[in-house]
UniProtKB/Swiss-Prot annotation:
PROSITE patterns attached to this UniProt entry: EF_TS_1 (PS01126), EF_TS_2 (PS01127)
Annotated region described as Involved in Mg(2+) ion dislocation from EF-Tu, given as residue ranges: 84-87
One GO cellular component, as annotated: cytoplasm
Protein name: Elongation factor Ts
Organism encoding this protein: Caulobacter vibrioides (strain NA1000 / CB15N)
Length: 312
């Protein structure tokens, strides 16, 4: 049997990312063969990965990738989830998130297409994540994604609470169409992206807003106005005013720009168009906040201790 040296254990640990004791055991089981030990660890890890698949993955990273496309650009934002915030600082996980966002550029931007996309090494995104689950020991998944493309202009991006370049807890894309100067368009797009990160608008314009959301607010405002006991004509004007204020709060183009509340985002865009001497239009935006809508499991510490000591 080959001697299991510290150097061998270190090499296997660096290649696999697995703990030293597991590496030592793998080498012992495979007569010191590094490649066979890696396969052994993968097989061992994969058997555990299925058990981890039902754990809530509400942490992780939002990754962004951008590529020029003729006179325009395409960009993707991908939310890759893991179970703990600790993993988001892991180099392997960060590298995977970047690779996945890059692979998403060549897809239609749907989660199914992204998980089926192939990475540079030839394996699919899903296979890569499955192997990473085995290595790191946490459930991981591509939860949400978005892709924007403009034929002329830029897709600006912004990462809030960045862990590393193009990686963080909130990722925003803003598609800006124009034949104007790209540097100026990118500055405009980034400012709007920062605004979106801060205000979380529901839609780009009033026409894009879900009619059900408007009706819901209108019902609330109507009830409040009727309780005032004022004449019907006055009540109608009150409702109109409150709906207008609601739109100013949740519609991006109607919102007061956070960096200059004296103007709306729509006015900022018009001002930029005038300066550039070319039409400028915000085509759309996406805001991905890590773990948004995921119900995190609240562990019962006493029950956990009891189960570990066999007292449950």
């Amino acid at each position: 049997m080959a001697e299991i040296t510290a150097a061998l254990v270190k090499e296997l640990r660096e290649k696999s990312g697995v703990g030293m004791m597991d590496c030592k055991k793998a080498l012992a089981e495979n007569n010191g063969d590094i490649e066979a030990s890696i396969d052994w660890l993968r097989a061992k890890g994969l058997s555990k990965a299925a058990k981890k698949a039902d754990r809530a993955a509400a942490e992780g990273l939002v990754a962004i990738a951008t590529a020029e496309q003729g006179a325009g650009e395409t960009a993707t934002a991908v939310e890759v989830n893991a179970e703990t915030d600790f993993v988001s600082r892991n180099d392997l996980f960060q590298g995977a998130a970047r690779q996945i966002a890059g692979a998403a550029l060549g897809t239609d931007g749907s989660v199914d297409a992204i998980t089926a996309a192939k990475l540079a090494g030839g394996e699919t995104v899903q296979d890569h994540l499955t192997n990473l689950i085995a290595t790191i020991g946490e459930n991981m998944m591509v939860r949400r994604a978005a892709k924007w493309t403009v034929e002329n202009g830029v897709v600006a991006s912004y990462i809030h609470n960045a862990t590393a370049p193009d990686l963080g807890r909130i990722g925003v894309l803003v598609a800006v169409e124009s034949t104007g100067d790209k540097a100026a368009l990118r500055e405009l797009g980034r400012k709007i992206a920062m605004h979106v990160a801060a205000t979380s608008p529901l839609s780009l314009s009033p026409d894009d807003l879900d009619p059900a959301a408007i009706e819901r607010e209108k019902a609330v405002f109507t009830e409040q106005a009727l309780e005032s006991g004022k004449p019907a004509a006055v009540v109608e004007k009150m409702i109109e005013g409150r709906i207008r204020k609601f739109l100013e709060e949740v519609v991006l183009l109607k919102q007061a720009f956070v960096m200059n509340p004296d103007q709306t985002v729509e006015q900022l865009v018009a001002e930029t168009a005038k300066t550039l001497g070319a039409p400028v239009a915000v085509k759309g935006f996406t805001r991905l906040a890590l773990g948004e809508g995921v119900e995190k499991k609240q562990d019962d510490f006493a029950a956990e201790v009891a189960s570990m000591t066999g007292q449950a």
